[in-house]
């Protein structure tokens, strides 16, 4: 019976049972835990961050770095989209280039390589969960990320994971903690990209990110996104403001970077046919009387489209953007512009809330006048 046995543990952690009558020399001891609080000391730059994501899709695109930097002013940091998570075991695929980094360094620009859980390699919530819910897989991923960072000589790692489900939240933040420790040991800056805070993305745990990461970046765009059932601005003034004020409830201002778009969307709305209306009955789509398509355009292309349509823009005070609409081929077109006026309003928010800096998606989509403006606010 149980009374005849005692549960014991050896000094090296093996647990089992022994018979009471075999136990001799009993004594009581207080065991102290040798637990050391993890050090999450942070790297903080002594200048306003002006980071541009560089959407690099293949090895050859790295050669454009000289041309891209030459167009900018006041740029402090480049975040090339070099790294994809190749599989759920934590292997990475990389198009990182040491030449790119050394060129950027000669121009006094830091490089924080971006790693993503979409757009090549894994690209679903289930796969991100499969990856992050295993300690061993997180370890593989972190080891490969650090090795690649050291191989090409980057200054930091930028994490852009956008496929984190509710159940994955605890594993994701553990990954950020573990990566943070390794970045610290190797002198690498860790920045983490985040959605504008909403009730449905609390699993990203911005509060904990604000402790363990060096910088927390808000992606202040995709308010209305590709596949959105209705047309609207990509990045209205209030959306950016809400992103900042909500993030500041959990993260100190000196760690917050406000991400803004260099792109916009042209929306095409077409009335649904009788057949489409019928097939949408009883679904979420029923509330919309039009089908909506959109394409993303950089600033200059957006201006050209409006000019070609022969219409004028009007200032949409609520959105804080210039707006245009017109009809053609039985469809209605709408566009909320990103231009110097809308960008300046967003940069003023960065200043007002004394944030660490700004970030832009993405390099090459801006009009040439934008950099003079940005330089005014980051210096």
Language-model-derived ranges and their functions:
Residues 1-3:
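Conserved beta-strand/loop element in small beta-rich adapter and peptidoglycan-binding domains
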Residues 9-43, 48:
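Boundary regions of SH3-family modules and the immediately adjacent low-complexity/disordered segments
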Residues 31-36, 120-122, 127, 264-346, ...:
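Glycan-binding loop/region signatures in secreted carbohydrate-active enzymes
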Residues 61-86, 144-157, 346-357:
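Catalytic domains of carbohydrate-active enzymes, especially glycoside hydrolases
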Residues 76-83, 98-136, 143-156, 178-189:
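Substrate-binding cleft and catalytic face of glycoside hydrolase catalytic domains
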Residues 78, 159, 179, 216, ...:
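Conserved, mostly hydrophobic/aromatic
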Residues 88-95, 143, 166-302:
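Substrate-binding surface in catalytic domains of secreted glycosidases
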Residues 342-379:
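Acidic/aromatic/glycine-rich contiguous surface patches that form carbohydrate-binding/processing clefts
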């Amino acid at each position: 019976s149980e009374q005849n046995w005692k549960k014991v543990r050896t000094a090296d952690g093996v647990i089992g049972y022994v018979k009471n009558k075999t136990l001799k020399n009993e004594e009581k001891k207080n065991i102290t835990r040798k637990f050391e609080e993890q050090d999450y000391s942070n790297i903080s730059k002594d200048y306003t961050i002006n980071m541009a994501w560089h959407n690099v899709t293949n090895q050859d695109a790295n050669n454009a770095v000289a041309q891209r930097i030459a167009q900018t002013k006041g740029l402090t940091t480049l975040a090339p989209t070099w790294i994809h998570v190749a599989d759920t075991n934590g292997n990475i695929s990389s198009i990182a280039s040491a030449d790119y980094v050394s060129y950027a360094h000669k121009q006094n620009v830091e490089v924080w390589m971006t790693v993503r859980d979409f757009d090549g390699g894994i690209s679903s919530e289930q796969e991100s969960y499969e990856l992050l819910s295993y300690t061993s897989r997180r370890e593989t991923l972190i080891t490969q990320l650090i090795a690649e960072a050291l191989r090409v000589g980057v200054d930091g790692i930028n994490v852009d994971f956008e496929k984190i489900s509710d159940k994955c939240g605890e594993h994701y933040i553990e990954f950020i903690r573990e990566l943070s420790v390794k970045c610290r040991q190797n002198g690498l800056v860790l920045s983490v990209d985040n959605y504008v805070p909403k009730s449905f993305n609390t699993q990203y745990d911005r509060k904990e990110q604000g402790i363990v990461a060096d910088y927390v970046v808000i992606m202040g765009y995709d308010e209305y996104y590709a596949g959105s059932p209705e047309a609207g601005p990509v990045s209205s003034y209030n959306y950016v403001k809400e992103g900042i004020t909500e993030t500041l409830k959990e993260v100190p201002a000196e760690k917050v970077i406000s991400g803004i778009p260099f792109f916009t969307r042209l929306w095409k709305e077409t009335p649904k046919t009788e057949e489409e209306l019928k097939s949408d009955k009883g679904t979420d789509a029923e509330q919309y009387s039009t089908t909506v398509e959109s394409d993303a355009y950089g600033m200059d292309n957006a201006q050209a489209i409006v000019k070609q349509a022969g219409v004028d823009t009007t200032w949409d005070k609520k959105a804080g953007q210039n707006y245009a609409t017109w009809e053609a081929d039985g469809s209605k077109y709408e566009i909320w512009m990103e231009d110097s006026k809308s960008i300046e309003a967003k940069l003023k928010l960065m200043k007002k809330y004394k944030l660490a800096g700004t970030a832009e998606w993405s390099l090459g989509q801006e009009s040439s006048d934008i950099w003079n403006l940005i330089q005014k606010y980051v210096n």
